[in-house]
């Protein structure tokens, strides 16, 4: 029953937020925040008191804490949700940044507050569902349900209100990209289910059953490629990145926190959970191509980020660059790099979200996202420059932060398998220092281009920034706390993915 609360609470919180707006416009945000808090307490309850570590590898039953209810029995579809250490970590990230996103929007949303928080809660519910669904139809359901509320967030609460038509066009682009991703995934899931039916005469979407059924080599590569394309479009990886920068440029900052912090991380989760485990042979054959795409994203994202004049687009392209490293970790590394990937997902999500939050404060102060209009702000703005410098340095992997630990483990794990790949990846990481420090120099140093009054960081954003700083330092100094949670899951995923047939 506890597991079902992970999706029930956000859903009901969104519904209550929507209807409560009719009574008092401040009620929806309190309901949304309470819903996130209760969901987080539920995850903590599962983490402390339930046994999700037990693995029975001999029978391939790797999940001990799960809920299975009949749903569409005639097609073998169940409401099957479960957690392991990997899921627990991703749930903590989603809920932590979900609370941050709600707090960031606290006084920023001036219209349709009830509908806004409904969409935020549906995005978070869908993201949570992706991390706990172990029926492939249910996984697809949650994967797709995120699309609709994200469409409304960009089209109705865009950052630049004067250009409504362009925002709708950008929302349409996002819709098309993600819809293509969903259709490819659905076709691949159906082929996988058909393969199981041909061999066992049973229709099922159960992940555990599909996991132990070898896929015919004649179609394994095709199905794997379908899953891969669906995930890298959402990640996104070059050349399927066209929607991300436009989306972030026009999205509300709380929406950017959601999508960068949690939503994009559903893709590397899916690659590890599904591609690596369901299609070991095809994944092994495809690894060189995936690594090449990772390199392409790393270097392209870094170079384009360096040339950006819009602060939100710069941060978006930096995210693409980091996603390239994550893809290389998945396809070119080992168990060590997988553990590094977990830390990198957490740290990159936090540092990038923090940069978005601070850029929102700069926009509130200057009414522009154009870096060329900035300069010399260090003496005009209190706290923001120092915080921005910390998060920029964290993003490029300064020691003492979680980003450093994640990158170190990833590169160390890759080096054991492919030394040359690790060396090239290191060069790619160096480029992140160029665009990060260039951004800081252009915004906060040099001569001021305008006569700006003194500006103080909002007290709410100040404490949010402090919390995010402590989170990154915690991951940098005590990463073992997280690695212990995810170890059993990652160990199982790595060993199971090595069963080359």
From Swiss-Prot:
Subcellular location: Cell membrane
Enzyme's top EC category: translocase
Keyword Signal: no
Bilayer-spanning residue ranges: 1-21, 30-50, 86-106, 115-134, 139-156, 174-194, 222-242, 252-272, 286-306, 314-331, 341-363, 374-394, 420-440, 459-479
Keywords from the named record: Cell membrane, Membrane, NAD, Quinone, Translocase, Transmembrane, Transmembrane helix
Enzyme Commission designation: 7.1.1.-
Any one biological process term the GO annotation gives: ATP synthesis coupled electron transport
Highest taxon listed in the record's lineage: Bacteria
Reactions listed under catalytic activity: a quinone + NADH + 5 H(+)(in) = a quinol + NAD(+) + 4 H(+)(out)
Entry similarity comment: Belongs to the complex I subunit 4 family.
Function per UniProt: NDH-1 shuttles electrons from NADH, via FMN and iron-sulfur (Fe-S) centers, to quinones in the respiratory chain. Couples the redox reaction to proton translocation (for every two electrons transferred, four hydrogen ions are translocated across the cytoplasmic membrane), and thus conserves the redox energy in a proton gradient.
Subunit structure: Composed of 13 different subunits. Subunits NuoA, H, J, K, L, M, N constitute the membrane sector of the complex.
Designated name of the protein: NADH-quinone oxidoreductase subunit M
Taxonomic lineage from the root: Bacteria, Pseudomonadati, Pseudomonadota, Gammaproteobacteria, Enterobacterales
């Amino acid at each position: 029953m506890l597991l079902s609360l992970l999706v029930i609470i956000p859903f009901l919180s969104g519904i209550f937020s929507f209807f409560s707006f009719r009574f008092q416009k401040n009620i929806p945000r309190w309901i949304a925040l309470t819903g996130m808090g209760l969901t987080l307490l539920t995850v903590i309850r599962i983490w402390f008191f339930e046994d999700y570590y037990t693995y029975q590898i001999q029978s391939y039953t790797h999940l001990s804490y799960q809920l299975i209810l009949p749903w569409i029995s005639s097609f073998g579809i169940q409401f099957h949700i479960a957690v392991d250490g990997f899921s627990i970590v991703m749930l903590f990230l989603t809920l932590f940044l979900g609370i941050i996103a709600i707090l960031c929007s606290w006084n920023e949303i001036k219209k349709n507050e009830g509908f806004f928080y409904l969409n935020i809660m549906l995005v978070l519910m869908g993201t949570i569902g992706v991390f706990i669904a172990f029926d492939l139809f249910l996984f697809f359901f949650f994967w797709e349900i995120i699309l609709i509320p994200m469409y409304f967030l960009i089209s109705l609460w865009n950052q630049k209100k004067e250009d409504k038509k362009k925002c709708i066009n950008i929302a349409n682009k996002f819709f098309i990209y993600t819809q293509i991703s969903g259709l490819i995934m659905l076709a691949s899931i159906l082929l996988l289910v058909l393969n199981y039916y041909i061999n066992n005469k049973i229709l099922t979407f159960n992940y555990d059953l599909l996991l132990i059924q070898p896929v015919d080599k004649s179609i394994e590569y095709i199905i794997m490629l379908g899953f891969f394309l669906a995930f890298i479009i959402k990640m996104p990886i070059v050349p399927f990145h066209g929607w991300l920068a436009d989306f972030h440029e026009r999205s509300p900052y709380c929406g950017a926190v959601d999508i960068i912090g949690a939503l994009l991380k559903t893709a590397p989760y899916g690659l590890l959970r599904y591609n690596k485990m369901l299609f070991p042979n095809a994944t092994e054959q495809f690894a060189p191509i995936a690594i090449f795409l990772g390199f392409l994203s790393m270097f392209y994202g870094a170079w384009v980020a360096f040339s950006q004049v819009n602060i939100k687009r710069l941060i978006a392209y930096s995210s693409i660059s980091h996603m390239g490293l994550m893809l290389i970790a998945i396809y070119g590394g080992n168990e060590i790099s997988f553990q590094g990937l977990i830390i990198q997902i957490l740290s990159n999500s936090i540092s990038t979200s923090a940069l978005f939050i601070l850029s929102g404060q700069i926009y509130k102060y200057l009414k522009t996202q154009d870096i060329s209009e900035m300069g010399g702000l260090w003496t005009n703005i209190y706290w923001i420059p120092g915080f921005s410098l910390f998060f920029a340095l964290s993003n490029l992997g300064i020691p003492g932060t979680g980003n450093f630990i994640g990158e170190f483990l990833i590169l160390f794990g890759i080096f054991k398998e492919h030394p040359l790949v690790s060396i090239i990846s290191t060069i790619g990481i160096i480029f992140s220092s160029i665009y990060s420090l260039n951004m800081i120099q252009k915004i906060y140093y040099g001569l001021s281009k305008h006569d700006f009054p003194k500006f103080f960081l909002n007290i709410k954003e100040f404490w949010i920034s402090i919390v995010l700083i402590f989170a990154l330092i915690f991951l940098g100094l005590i990463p073992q706390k997280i690695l212990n949670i995810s170890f059993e899951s990652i160990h199982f995923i790595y060993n199971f993915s090595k069963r080359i047939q």
